[in-house]
């Protein structure tokens, strides 16, 4: 086979690329050099049980089949080296990274051991030892690069001065060539920001803040153009040279990247087909009778060679046999035995350094909550459209009511009672929706960020929830006061300042309850559209059962009457009815006494309507307020519990 241009002396990086065949453990015994950090993965296997049929097919749903995702994978890599894990979609690349980093869910069966500097790690130590950059870059879009990294540093590192955080962030940005975009916003699909390659660098920078010795990156070049992908790999290779272990998975690598990797591993259906240096890879496949053609991309050639072609049954059998032959050949090769020897030698070598845990001395619970609150507030305050809509969406609804009703009357023949009942019904029914719309629009991105950062150990998911709750409280109060101030006096409701205060307080509660109920459901259901539908259904049902406006509560079936006590609409409606109707006197047809016998003239005082619609509500006015506002902390506590459970389920 002719010499490949990227393995010639001019194209290679000198001794850096050739050191994989002789580990530093062996070098140390010869030259006496200081041993470096090492990562060993020994006989790792992972399988899950899947149901045969869909959940609605009871017979087939009860049957299960075991799926082997990883099978007897062993790797060895040292600091100063970068390893590339190749494989087609579904080959187990991401699962292998999850297994090494301790992020695999416990729903499957994991076997094997992971060693760092010869020490087997416990599950609770994985998070403190490895940094993991996911394939998707999830950030708060309205923060700048500098702010994003600074808040991450404040969450991850010990409490210190602002100068300490600034120096740390500036050093990392300089190392990753981000200084020129430090004050640019991250951006999103709604508005421009930094480029995809720069976003990927920010993801890497966020992990580097804790000085990790082992970094893993899942598909870091996916979605990037050729030049940017090459720059990212060069950057990672440079990071590896600075006494780090770097492992990346790549789906479709370019030939130019071949020379930058110290070790290359190839996975097929969860089995290791090869793991070694680029030179060892060329020699291994050449000895197996599959030399790489001159001027071909070794990545493409050997990925095609180790993939199973499922286009036809004959091709599938043929290619599967070839892959099995290559797997057996690798397990019998000196390269594989050298991997096992290095892992075993590291376990008993006493000169290796201790396990290199990340620099991690984070602030306490309330310190993290304060950082999250400041970060959430700064991010959401820059979203001008969201801020404006939060403040005026209730007011917009109120303006429609004003244009429709103009001003409520005291004449029962002109709809004095009916107009007030319709107004209160709309107010109690609409205010939870505005809260729900806010949460559905703003919280899913915060949830995505917290899902990722909580896996990095920066904080717990419920702390992000509580930070959002504290952030929305003042906005909700201001929005409700603006809405109430315009609607209450313009519509001509009971002209008393104290009544206006009760009115505003009564409408604030369902607005908050609607938003917090949405947050609770967002902790259970991933799709915001489904949450939207659930909240709408619950709000309509609660209003029908609890308000007493559609059907007299006393005439309801006992189960519905009992169910009404668990709806916040019952207490809110009783408060608003008493607040508006108590002490109110109605006229009927003016001075025309012939109209006094009209059925609509039966109600001449507001107290009559109160006793007819919600008997005893006047005496329960204070209790109703306490119960209504009791829903708010109850939902917050329920949300914290659910997000704690979510934290556990994602990490298990």
Swiss-Prot record:
Residues 1-384, 444-468, 523-529, 646-652 are cytoplasmic. PROSITE patterns: ABC_TRANSPORTER_1, ABC_TRANSPORTER_2. Cholesterol transport is inhibited by vanadate and by beryllium fluoride. A lipid is attached at residue 61 (S-palmitoyl cysteine). N-glycosylated. N-glycosylation is important for efficient export out of the endoplasmic reticulum. The keyword Transferase does not apply. It is linked to A spontaneous mutation gives raise to thrombocytopenia and cardiomyopathy (trac), with recessive inheritance and fully penetrant phenotype. Mice are small, infertile, and have shortened lifespan. Belongs to the ABC transporter superfamily. ABCG family. Eye pigment precursor importer (TC 3.A.1.204) subfamily. ABCG5 and ABCG8 form an obligate heterodimer that mediates Mg(2+)- and ATP-dependent sterol transport across the cell membrane. Plays an essential role in the selective transport of dietary plant sterols and cholesterol in and out of the enterocytes and in the selective sterol excretion by the liver into bile. Required for normal sterol homeostasis. The heterodimer with ABCG8 has ATPase activity. This is ATP-binding cassette sub-family G member 5. It comes from Mus musculus (Mouse). The gene is Abcg5.
